[in-house]
């Protein structure tokens, strides 16, 4: 689990019950400090309408449930029982930990880095900070406490911040009501270590990693000036350190639309079906873009907190790898793209010792060790006592993490797949198998420039050669052919109903349909008289000539349709290749679309408690093609688009929770009608004739699978199109429709819908109220039947519709509020806990 936001350090058992009843659902859980046993913890889980409390023992060396598996940290314990489901009552009933109930950050200040280990904090500050740079993070060993990490010359000092009696202190001296007050105090009054070193808090080291659910607070902070600061930092870090020799060659220069926007050599697409005797025949200005592994290079969660982290190498391999890696690798605990290319390391290229170790390694390891103060190369940490006024500090690395060997992963396999270099340590067939395995989990993109068609050069043929070679079935064009009187992209397709030959490619435009935001064209493409393939061309046409779109919803809707198409092609067995994205230069708008889709894809897989890092994601994709996300305005737009998506998702979940409380049962909800006849509807073929929504013991709230198909933004496609790799932590999300027959109660949420619809209208009063509630959110339909205004409706409009809905209902009887069990009676579960693995029953405590 990438976040520990399920830990609520300040609430009691009564408050935990109330919180779970009001905001949670079946399977929601949180962890808190024990009210009866200082130093221990309690896991509170909602099961139906009851809340079960499970005691967690902490003896100073390990955490356990009074028996069973032992864990070094509380996050390891929670992660284990979420994934393995071995927690049962004595009567055999399972206690499922489905979805964490997120706790608000203790502060919105950007110097707070959340669940960051001491080792990671040291690397960040020593690599990128200055003398006096500081940050605050959560304590790895004592949940509920925090650590202040400060750079003092060539070392990092860690000062423990205690949470006691609803106050913060550093082990002595004054107490403060908030972390901000504490930091402000020690900015003015520096601490002094026992060795005499003065610890100055000069400048904050601001975080870019955040919990997805907390994006509103982060955007509010960035609006004050942080956007410019983050983007400028990104510009300085994204130096061109990769070769672009092929693009500079004389025979290839005319193929570049812009002289200095060239593809990196290590990720560029190479054309195979060409006349190799012609110099530069295999060159095209295009790069592969993808995540090397799940969250690799930008999901900065500590590997020591993950039970599924990579197996550590033997000392020889680790030392050799560490010596080869650059400072950026050390910073991220991962092998960066450049080092991966230089050394051609794959995860399975370790020595025999490492392979044997991977078979026998236990799942649970100690992730922390104690040590005294050390310089930047230190190896351990532990709480100590120093300072002139009882300041508790930790002088040295806080939480050492296991170095991973060769975590460049699938990306290297991908690069070697398209490389003429056969000297790598691993065969092409092994890289192919690895690439196929991870292709199922992560999308690959091709970022390229707009086509050129002049008397001197024609790249249209090369473009279609690449599309055919890569089996690309979806092309995303984010620019007009002409903007401000200048050609941005040559037309590389024929008019509707016509065919055209481009070299060996024959293109037939079968259909062309337009919405208010984009045009969808369907092509039949054949190459060298081979059987034709269906290829879909999504042409986004409302990006303004200057700046970015005012409404992120239009981009989210567009990406939703793109990903829905890609997922349907995969289900049809066509095995679509990378999504090809281009604008004019292939870096600005192209990068913006790709990064938004990557971030949302992560949220779809891991839920709202996942930690995202927009700046680091852009830094990662820029290591594969230079300049992606070109301007500060585009950088802001990525934040706003992700924020809009999360706000809409949260509003949708709340609406569905409220609908469940009313108690109505919906069945036979059908979506019918022709698609494509209305220019305002999504131009997609009909694929879902009827969807039934029936009551179940499982609460109808979103799962990771139901949030999408693993294709980023395919909302609702989980009704049979779920991503098999999606996390199980999210609850199921039903597809619902507005009722158009209840005196207009839900109609505003159904405008511009993706096809006609009919709903069951029995018991009109409560049915109308629920549909008004759900209709006001503007829910997107599953599969091909998308509500075109799902993301575009602002939350303010949604709230207005919800407030107006009861008035529009006239004299319709309002449903009685649902009955809830009164919180206050703690059902402490201390004895009936059974662990399936060992079939043990543990005694009462």
From Swiss-Prot:
Active site residues according to the UniProt entry: 583 (phosphocysteine intermediate)
Function description: Required in all receptor tyrosine kinase signaling pathways. Functions downstream of the receptor tyrosine kinase torso, acting in concert with D-Raf via tailless. Also functions downstream of Egfr (epidermal growth factor receptor) and btl (fibroblast growth factor receptor). The SH2 domain suggests that csw effects its role by mediating heteromeric protein interactions. Maternally required for normal determination of cell fates at the termini of the embryo.
Phosphoserine: residues bearing it: 419
Pfam families per the record? SH2, Y_phosphatase
Per UniProt, subcellular location reads as: Cytoplasm
Domain SH2 intervals: 6-101, 111-205
Family that this chain belongs to: Belongs to the protein-tyrosine phosphatase family. Non-receptor class subfamily.
- Where do the TM regions start and end? none
Q: Write the Enzyme Commission number(s) for this entry.
A: 3.1.3.48
Per the UniProt entry, what species is this protein from, by scientific name? Drosophila melanogaster (Fruit fly)
Q: What is this protein called?
A: Tyrosine-protein phosphatase corkscrew
Additional information: The PTPase domain is interrupted by a PTPase insert which shares no homologies with other PTPase proteins. This PTPase insert is reminiscent of the kinase insert within the kinase catalytic domains of several receptor tyrosine kinases.
User: What keywords is this UniProt entry annotated with?
Assistant: Cytoplasm, Developmental protein, Hydrolase, Phosphoprotein, Protein phosphatase, Repeat, SH2 domain
